[in-house]
Amino acid sequence: MNSKSSSLDVNKGAGEAKGNAKTQEKQGAKELKRNYVIDQNTEVLGQGAFGKVFKTYNKHNKELQVAIKVLSKSKLKDHLEAIKDEVDILTKLDHPNIVKYYETYIDERYIYLVMEYIGGGELFDKIAQSENQTFTEEDSQIYMRKLFSACNHMHAQGVVHRDIKPENIMMTQEGELKLIDFGLS
């Protein structure tokens, strides 16, 4: 992710594509299914008021697992600008402790945001599972340094995350932190 700029037009329908190669909006579900495996067996990672998040992989690079946020335009109505803002923010950010944004697909009914899959779960769950055990002071310092580094990067890009909490910090399977949720979930 180098010098990316977003030109997301959430109000358009299928058949209209625009944007640069990295942030290009593509023609909805058909194009999405050409590049990613999406079917009735696709794992649902989560569900919110505006849609669902699915875990899948790229058909051309099966090792590239992704999370696809599928958002209903009809449920979003008054929040379409927030989606545009989230994409604009994610295209600015390139940091090892911030979720990576790959691309957007849009059709008449849905907006599909393709992002990095983070397989280790929420920091909140890691804290809750530890019951009487807490993170060591050394581990806590390492995690806080990484979180501060991500915040410093965001601030340098003019971005302020207004909802940093354990539920919005994911852990990779290798134990790395990734800050998520820059708009609507």
Can you say where each PLM-predicted feature lies in the sequence?
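Protein kinase catalytic-loop region centered on the HRD/HxD motif
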Residues: 149-159
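Protein kinase glycine-rich loop
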Residues: 42-49, 53
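Conserved short submotifs of the Hanks-type protein kinase catalytic core
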Residues: 109-122, 126
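Conserved N-lobe beta3->alphaC-helix segment of eukaryotic protein kinase catalytic domains
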Residues: 65, 70-93
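Activation-segment/catalytic-loop signature of the eukaryotic protein kinase fold
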Residues: 104
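Activation segment signature within eukaryotic-like protein kinase domains
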Residues: 143-144
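AlphaC helix of the protein kinase catalytic domain
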Residues: 124-135
